[in-house]
Amino acid sequence: MGSNGSELWFNKELEYSQQLTNGKMKEFFFLVSETMDWLNEHMLEVSKLQLESDIYELVRTPTKIKEKYSTPRLSPVHRCALPTPRMRLTSIQHQLEEAAVEGYKSGESNTVKEPKELHTATNTETQFDDDRDSTKLSSEYVKDDIVNKSTKGGVSPIKETRLPTNLPAFSPTSVERRFTEWNVPLRETSPSPSETADSPNKLPKQKHPAYSFVTLPKREEILKRPASLHSRVESTNSFINQLNRRRTKDNLTNNPEISLDEPIKALPSTTSDAPSSLLNTNVSSSPSKFRKFLSSVIPAKTDLSAKESLTSSTRLSTSYKTRKRSSGVAFSSETVTSSSKERKRSVENEMLKPHPTIFESPPEITSFDKSNAVEAEALTAKLKSNEERLPVSSQPGSDAKSQEFDFFEAKIPDSIAKLNELTASNENHYELKTYDRAERLRQKIQEVSSNKRLIPSTPPTKKPINAVLDAAKNSAAKDLHLAKMKLNNKNDESSLSPAKSHAVITQAPKIPLISTFTRLSTRKSSNDFNSSNSRPSSNALKSDANENTDSSLPPSKKEFIEKSLHKLSEPLHDDSRQNSDHNFAPHSRPIAIRVATASQRELEQTEKRKAKNGAANASNMESRSSENETHRFKKFYGKERELSNNEFPSRQTKTVTSANSSNIRDMEHTISDKPRSEPDAIPSSKSMHSNKPFEEKSEKPTTKRLVTNPSNVNASWHSNMLKRQEDLRKKKPLTDNGATSRHMLKSGLTRVTSKPTQRFANELAEDMSLAFHSTIPKKMEPDSVTSVTQPSVGSLRNNFDIGTTNSQNEDRKKKIAAQKNKNPVHGNVGLTNQHGFKTMHHNVNPFTKQNGIMKGKLPSSSTSQSNKPFIEKASMHAPAKGRNSSMQEPSSKSPLLKTPKSNYFPGYGSLSPNTSVELPEINSDYSDDSDDEGNKKKVNLPSWAESPELREQLKRQQKWDPDKIFGMIKPLQMDEYFRSKDRSKIRFRPRSSSADWSSQDRLTQAEIDNYKKNMGFL
C-alpha cells in the first residue's frame, strides 16, 4: 500500500472520528441540559426547607427526601456519565439571580398589591415579602407608584388608579415571553386562601442564605406540569388556567370573609378613598373587559341560564375583590371612549348573555321548582326594566363610568340577595322533598314486609342466618353425642384412680342436645324444623340424655349429667324465643344448608355399623340355644378383660389374670342358670369400684365384632357386665375355705401381655385339650384382640411343647398340682411379686425358648374369621382342662366334651424342629450368566469385525503372553500420583497385609506357571 492510499484512509478516518465526536458532544450537551433542568426542579423542592436545621435533618435522614420530595411522575430522569463541568457554581447562581429579576420585571411586576387597609385579617404584606424576598426593590416601586397615583385629588378614581402604560397587559404572548426567558417558572405571588387565613400574624420566615435567590412554584404545580422542553410554554398557559379555576373555586367555598348574603357590601362609594376602590372599580367599571379576560383564560359555557350568569358574575367580582390575582398578572384599564348607550348595551349583554364560570353550578340552583324559575324570570325582567330607566348622559369618560358604577352599586346587591333567598328556600324545599320521599319509601317497605301474602324478590336476610345457626347447633349436638360415647369409653381406659375418670366428665363440650338436622331443608321442612327447635325444652334434652345415660351410667353419674344439661339448656331459652320470631315464612325459598363435620361423619358410620349388627342379631337368635357354653366362656372373658383394662388403658395390650377353680365352677353354674348376652364394651373403672347396683337391660345376643377403638363401643354393655359381677359376688358359696377367698380375682393386680400370637390352629392339630386347658375360650375377632388367664406360676415356667404327647402333658399337670399344694397362696400376687409387670411377647418362634404363656393359642387376623365356626363348635365339645388337677372337672358331667382325634391341620402337625427347608439360591453378582445369554439381545457387529483376517489375527494373539509385551504389573504407588511438596513426608500409609500384593502375600511362582499353562502362554 502506498503513502497516498494510507493518507487518504487516514483523512477519512479522522473526519469520521471528528463527526462522531461532534455528534457525541451535542448529545452530551443535550443530556446535560436536560439533567440540569431536572436537578433544578428538585433543588427548588429542597429549598422549601427555609431553615438550616431542616436541611441538616434531611442530610441526616435522607429517607425523608424520598417520602416528601419524590421524583415527579412526568419528569424524565436521564442517567449518563457526566464529566466534571468547568462552569463554576457562582456563575450559575449569578444567572439564576438575573433570570429571577428579569422575570419579575417583564411579567410579574404587573401584579397589583392591595394595601393593608382593604383586608385587615390577612397580612398580605408579610406574604409578599416572604415570596419576593430577592425582588423587594421592584415590587415596592410598583406599590409606591400605585399609592402615589391613587392619592391625587380632584380626579376620578379610575384615572387615578390606572397603571403605567409601559407595563404589558395580560395576554398569552406575555406569558410566553415570560416563561421562555427562563425555563424554571417562578412561584406565583398569592398563596392559597387557606394559607392566608391561617397565618395572619406570622412573622416572615428566614430563608437559608444559599437559596435566598430562588422562588419556587408549588409541588402540586410541578407534578401537574409536563416536563417537555418543547411544550413548556403551552403547559404553562394551561397550568395558569387550571390554577385560576382552582383558586376561584377555593375562594368561593373556603374563604370565610366572603358571604353570599352580602356580596358587594365592601364595594366603596364614589366618595370613598381611591386606594380602597382600586381593584373593585377596575372590575366593575369594565364588565366587557372582565368578560374578555375570563374568556381568554377559561372556555365559555353556553348552557347556563341568565340567573346563573348573574350569580356567577357577582361571585367572581366578590372573589376578585377579596384576594390577589393567582396568575400574578394584572389587566390595565383603557380610556373609556364609548358613549352611555354603548355602555348600557354592554351592561345588558353582561346581564342577559350566558357568562363563563369557573365553578360548577351547585345542585340546588339547577334543581329549581317551577315556581322558583318563574320568580327568577320575573326578577331578570325587572332588572332589564331598571336598566332601561337609567339616565342617559352624553358625557364621555368619568361620568359614564360613575353612572355605571352607581347602577352596579344600587341594583346588583338587591338582585343577588333575592336570588340567594330563592336558592336557600329551594335548598330547604329540596331537603324536605328528599326526606318525604325517603319516608314514603320506608313506609312502603314496611307494608310489603308486614304483608305476608306478597312474595318478595329475595328472602329476608335473617332467615338464611337462622338456618346456618340451626344447622351448626345440630352439628354441635351430634358432636356432644359422640363426645358422650367417647367419654364413657375413656372411663374404661382411665388409670387406677376413679377421680381421673370423673375429671373427664367435666371436660365434655357444653353444647345442648338438639334434634338432628341432616336433610336439606325446603319450605315445609324448614318451618317444621323451626317450630320444633325454636323452643328447646328440658324434656327433649332429658329424653335424649336418658338414651345414653339410663342404661349405661350409675345414678350419681346420671344426676351429674342431667344437672349439666339443665344448666346448658337455660341460656338457650332466650335465644329460642328470639329465633322463633324469625321463623321461615311459607313463601320463603328453600334453603339447602348442611354443616358436616368430622364428628358427624364418624357418628353416621357408627350408626351404620349398629344397623348391620342389629340385622345379624335376628339371625343369631335361632342358634342361641346351641351357644350357651360359648356365652359362659365369653362372660368370664369379659370379666377378665374388664379387670385388666382398668390398669392399663392401652389400645392393643391385654391382661392375663389368674382364677381359682372354685370361681370358675360358680361362674359356670351361674351362666347355665341364666345365660347372658355377649359383652361389647368395657366397663368404666369408676363403675367397677363402686358397689351400687345397676339396672339390667336385656339385649339380644349379637355377633358384633369387638373393635379396639373405644369410640365405637356402645356404652350400654357396662351395666350388663357389672350386673353379672355383682351376681357372682352375691351367689358365691360361703363354704369355701380361706384359700379360696384368696384365689379370687383382684382387679388391682394384672399382668400385661403384648399382641397375641397367630398359632392357635397349630396346637389344635396336636391336642384340642391344650387349646382350652384354662377353661377360658379365646375371643375370635378380626383384630386378634383377646385376654387369657394366668393359672399359676408354674405354668409360666413349664409351658407345653407342640411335639409332646398327652401322657407327658398329664405328668406335667401332676407336677404343677404338687407345686400348688406346697404354695397355697398364689395368683396375681405371686405373679406380681416374682415377675412384676413383665411384658410377655407371643409373636416368637414356637421352636425357640418358651418365654411366654399360651404360645400359639390365638389365630391371626387373616384366618380368624374362617376358623371362627370351628372354634365355637370346638368350645362346646372341648374339655375344660387346666394346668392343675383342681381346675379339671370329671368327664361324666360333660360327656360331649371330648378331644377330637382328627387332625384338621395336617400341614402344621407334621412340622418338627428337625425339618429341613430348602430355599432357592440367592442371586449373586458372581453367578454364571450362561443361562441368561440366550435372553440377551444379539449385538449387531460392524462389517470389519466379521472379517476372516481379524479372526485369524485374534487367534494368533491368544497364545501371546501379555507380561512379555507390557511387563509385570507393578503395585499402585499413591505417592507417585499425588506428590507432596515435602518429599520426606509420606502422605499415605502403607497398605495392610490384606491388600498389599507387593509383600509376602504375592502369588508363588508355581501358581504363576500353572496359570500360564492354562492360558496357553507356555
UniProtKB/Swiss-Prot annotation:
The cross-references to InterPro entries, in alphabetical order and at most eight, read: Inner_centromere_prot_ARK-bd
Provide the GO biological process annotations. Answer: mitotic sister chromatid segregation; regulation of mitotic cytokinesis
Q: Where is this region: Disordered?
A: 184-207, 247-287, 306-365, 522-556, 570-756, 781-813, 848-867, 877-944
Biased composition range(s): Low complexity: 309-320, 890-902
> Which compartments is it annotated to reside in?
Nucleus; Cytoplasm, Cytoskeleton, Spindle
Primary location group: nucleus
Keyword line: Chromosome partition, Cytoplasm, Cytoskeleton, Nucleus, Phosphoprotein
Residue(s) carrying Phosphoserine = S171
Statement: the UniProt record of this protein carries the keyword Cytoplasm: yes
Cellular component annotations (GO), alphabetically ordered:
chromosome passenger complex; cytoplasm; kinetochore; mitotic spindle; nucleus
Instruction: Identify the domain of life.
Output: Eukaryota
- Recorded protein name is Inner centromere protein pic1
